[in-house]
Amino acid sequence: MPSDVASRTGLPTPWTVRYSKSKKREYFFNPETKHSQWEEPEGTNKDQLHKHLRDHPVRVRCLHILIKHKDSRRPASHRSENITISKQDATDELKTLITRLDDDSKTNSFEALAKERSDCSSYKRGGDLGWFGRGEMQPSFEDAAFQLKVGEVSDIVESGSGVHVIKRVG
Protein backbone atom coordinates (compact mmCIF):
# COMPACT_ATOMS: atom_id res chain seq x y z
CA MET A 1 0.00 0.00 0.00
CA PRO A 2 1.48 3.41 -0.92
CA SER A 3 2.46 5.79 1.87
CA ASP A 4 0.68 9.10 2.41
CA VAL A 5 3.62 10.94 0.81
CA ALA A 6 3.57 8.59 -2.19
CA SER A 7 -0.16 9.05 -2.73
CA ARG A 8 0.22 12.85 -2.63
CA THR A 9 3.37 13.14 -4.75
CA GLY A 10 3.04 10.24 -7.15
CA LEU A 11 6.50 9.02 -6.11
CA PRO A 12 7.07 5.40 -5.11
CA THR A 13 7.65 4.77 -1.39
CA PRO A 14 9.98 6.01 0.21
CA TRP A 15 11.10 8.63 -2.36
CA THR A 16 10.75 12.38 -1.66
CA VAL A 17 11.24 15.57 -3.67
CA ARG A 18 13.99 17.95 -2.60
CA TYR A 19 15.42 21.17 -4.01
CA SER A 20 19.06 21.79 -4.95
CA LYS A 21 20.06 25.36 -4.15
CA SER A 22 23.24 25.06 -6.22
CA LYS A 23 21.49 23.63 -9.32
CA LYS A 24 18.23 25.52 -8.67
CA ARG A 25 16.02 22.55 -9.48
CA GLU A 26 14.16 19.66 -7.90
CA TYR A 27 15.74 16.27 -7.35
CA PHE A 28 14.57 12.98 -5.87
CA PHE A 29 15.88 11.40 -2.66
CA ASN A 30 15.42 7.96 -1.15
CA PRO A 31 15.95 8.31 2.63
CA GLU A 32 16.34 4.55 3.12
CA THR A 33 19.24 4.14 0.69
CA LYS A 34 20.45 7.79 0.83
CA HIS A 35 20.41 7.74 -2.98
CA SER A 36 19.54 10.93 -4.87
CA GLN A 37 18.92 11.45 -8.57
CA TRP A 38 17.69 14.10 -10.99
CA GLU A 39 15.25 11.86 -12.91
CA GLU A 40 11.95 10.65 -11.47
CA PRO A 41 12.45 7.21 -9.89
CA GLU A 42 11.02 4.18 -11.64
CA GLY A 43 7.35 3.70 -10.80
CA THR A 44 6.56 7.42 -10.49
CA ASN A 45 3.07 8.55 -11.45
CA LYS A 46 4.26 11.50 -13.53
CA ASP A 47 0.84 13.16 -13.80
CA GLN A 48 0.41 13.06 -10.02
CA LEU A 49 3.99 14.33 -9.48
CA HIS A 50 3.50 17.28 -11.86
CA LYS A 51 0.20 18.17 -10.15
CA HIS A 52 1.87 17.95 -6.74
CA LEU A 53 4.76 20.19 -7.81
CA ARG A 54 2.32 22.71 -9.29
CA ASP A 55 0.13 22.74 -6.16
CA HIS A 56 3.00 22.49 -3.65
CA PRO A 57 5.96 24.30 -5.17
CA VAL A 58 9.44 23.65 -3.85
CA ARG A 59 10.27 27.28 -4.64
CA VAL A 60 8.36 30.45 -5.46
CA ARG A 61 9.15 33.84 -6.96
CA CYS A 62 7.70 36.90 -5.27
CA LEU A 63 7.69 40.66 -5.30
CA HIS A 64 7.20 42.49 -2.03
CA ILE A 65 6.95 45.91 -0.47
CA LEU A 66 8.56 46.22 2.96
CA ILE A 67 7.84 49.06 5.36
CA LYS A 68 10.24 49.04 8.29
CA HIS A 69 9.45 50.52 11.69
CA LYS A 70 11.47 51.47 14.77
CA ASP A 71 11.16 47.95 16.21
CA SER A 72 12.37 46.21 13.02
CA ARG A 73 15.48 44.10 13.45
CA ARG A 74 17.43 46.67 11.43
CA PRO A 75 15.53 49.98 11.48
CA ALA A 76 17.42 51.56 8.57
CA SER A 77 17.12 51.50 4.80
CA HIS A 78 18.18 53.27 1.62
CA ARG A 79 15.44 55.78 2.41
CA SER A 80 16.48 56.59 5.99
CA GLU A 81 19.46 55.78 8.20
CA ASN A 82 17.26 55.82 11.30
CA ILE A 83 13.66 54.70 10.92
CA THR A 84 11.53 56.03 13.76
CA ILE A 85 7.93 55.33 12.72
CA SER A 86 5.84 53.00 14.86
CA LYS A 87 4.70 49.57 13.75
CA GLN A 88 1.14 50.91 13.57
CA ASP A 89 2.22 53.81 11.34
CA ALA A 90 4.12 51.39 9.08
CA THR A 91 1.03 49.17 8.87
CA ASP A 92 -1.20 52.16 8.09
CA GLU A 93 1.18 53.28 5.33
CA LEU A 94 1.19 49.79 3.83
CA LYS A 95 -2.63 49.73 3.91
CA THR A 96 -2.62 52.99 1.94
CA LEU A 97 -0.29 51.47 -0.66
CA ILE A 98 -2.51 48.38 -0.93
CA THR A 99 -5.51 50.65 -1.50
CA ARG A 100 -3.60 52.39 -4.29
CA LEU A 101 -2.96 48.99 -5.88
CA ASP A 102 -6.63 48.04 -5.60
CA ASP A 103 -7.93 51.41 -6.85
CA ASP A 104 -6.04 51.53 -10.10
CA SER A 105 -3.75 48.62 -10.80
CA LYS A 106 -2.93 49.94 -14.27
CA THR A 107 -1.25 53.16 -13.10
CA ASN A 108 -0.04 51.91 -9.73
CA SER A 109 1.70 48.66 -10.53
CA PHE A 110 3.12 46.62 -7.70
CA GLU A 111 6.62 47.11 -9.13
CA ALA A 112 6.21 50.90 -9.33
CA LEU A 113 5.02 51.13 -5.73
CA ALA A 114 7.89 48.92 -4.55
CA LYS A 115 10.38 51.20 -6.32
CA GLU A 116 8.69 54.24 -4.82
CA ARG A 117 8.36 53.12 -1.21
CA SER A 118 9.84 49.74 -0.22
CA ASP A 119 12.53 49.77 2.47
CA CYS A 120 14.08 46.56 1.07
CA SER A 121 17.06 46.75 -1.28
CA SER A 122 14.88 44.83 -3.77
CA TYR A 123 13.10 48.15 -4.43
CA LYS A 124 15.59 48.62 -7.30
CA ARG A 125 14.08 45.55 -9.00
CA GLY A 126 10.46 46.49 -8.31
CA GLY A 127 10.47 44.40 -5.13
CA ASP A 128 11.55 41.23 -6.98
CA LEU A 129 13.12 38.75 -4.57
CA GLY A 130 13.71 36.15 -7.26
CA TRP A 131 13.12 32.44 -6.68
CA PHE A 132 13.42 31.07 -3.16
CA GLY A 133 12.68 27.84 -1.36
CA ARG A 134 11.62 26.88 2.12
CA GLY A 135 14.03 27.87 4.87
CA GLU A 136 15.41 30.90 3.02
CA MET A 137 13.06 33.60 4.34
CA GLN A 138 11.63 34.47 7.73
CA PRO A 139 8.91 31.93 8.63
CA SER A 140 5.91 34.30 8.56
CA PHE A 141 6.98 35.70 5.18
CA GLU A 142 7.70 32.26 3.76
CA ASP A 143 4.40 30.80 4.96
CA ALA A 144 2.45 33.63 3.33
CA ALA A 145 4.44 33.43 0.07
CA PHE A 146 3.94 29.67 -0.32
CA GLN A 147 0.18 29.95 0.36
CA LEU A 148 -0.33 32.39 -2.51
CA LYS A 149 -1.18 31.29 -6.02
CA VAL A 150 0.61 32.96 -8.94
CA GLY A 151 -0.80 36.47 -9.39
CA GLU A 152 -2.25 36.71 -5.87
CA VAL A 153 -1.35 39.44 -3.40
CA SER A 154 -1.14 38.76 0.33
CA ASP A 155 -2.70 40.55 3.23
CA ILE A 156 -0.24 42.40 5.46
CA VAL A 157 2.49 40.07 6.74
CA GLU A 158 4.52 40.91 9.84
CA SER A 159 8.12 39.74 10.21
CA GLY A 160 11.20 40.78 12.13
CA SER A 161 12.08 43.03 9.19
CA GLY A 162 8.84 45.03 9.32
CA VAL A 163 5.48 44.77 7.56
CA HIS A 164 5.15 43.44 4.02
CA VAL A 165 2.70 42.91 1.22
CA ILE A 166 3.71 40.06 -1.09
CA LYS A 167 2.77 39.27 -4.68
CA ARG A 168 3.57 35.81 -6.02
CA VAL A 169 4.72 35.91 -9.64
CA GLY A 170 6.14 32.41 -10.10
Swiss-Prot record:
GO biological process: negative regulation of transcription by RNA polymerase II; negative regulation of ubiquitin-dependent protein catabolic process; positive regulation of rDNA heterochromatin formation; positive regulation of RNA polymerase II transcription preinitiation complex assembly; positive regulation of transcription by RNA polymerase II; termination of RNA polymerase II transcription
Keyword Isomerase: yes
Location of the region described as Disordered in the Swiss-Prot/TrEMBL record: 30-53
Gene Ontology cellular component terms for the protein in this record: cytosol; nucleus
Domain notes: The WW domain binds to the phosphorylated tandem 7 residues repeats of RPB1.
Note: Present with 4401 molecules/cell in log phase SD medium.
The protein's name in its UniProt record: Peptidyl-prolyl cis-trans isomerase ESS1
Organism in which the protein naturally occurs: Saccharomyces cerevisiae (strain ATCC 204508 / S288c)
Organism taxonomic ancestry: Eukaryota, Fungi, Dikarya, Ascomycota, Saccharomycotina
